[in-house]
């Protein structure tokens, strides 16, 4: 499958059938690679955002773990906080985030089954924000790839500023 590392491609059909991902969007490099076909990506980063001020932002890791175990053995589980958990299943890293911010997604992209992708502009905004905290070559490459699609850098920066509440 274009955009996915081979071991991720092997399980993507099963992942697409999981009920636990319905409220999440696939974000990050993998979501971008599936849309732009710029590089192979292997991690599956799922994120959901606040929809109301009073919403409690938590990841139901026990429900997710139970469903992920239908794909393969849970090789690892790391609970970082009530809003962030990671698993390794069949050699693939899964991340689940419940973000306290409102969604930057303007156009939902249905990929397959229950997998929906954040749109390119939203991914760019999130990449720009994360680059303030870390410096990975792949993030710079992803921003370059986004700009190559014709998205205006000023529009992308404005979207990133709105997302980061600046």
Per-region residue spans from a language model:
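Compositionally biased terminal segments of proteins
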Residues: 1-166
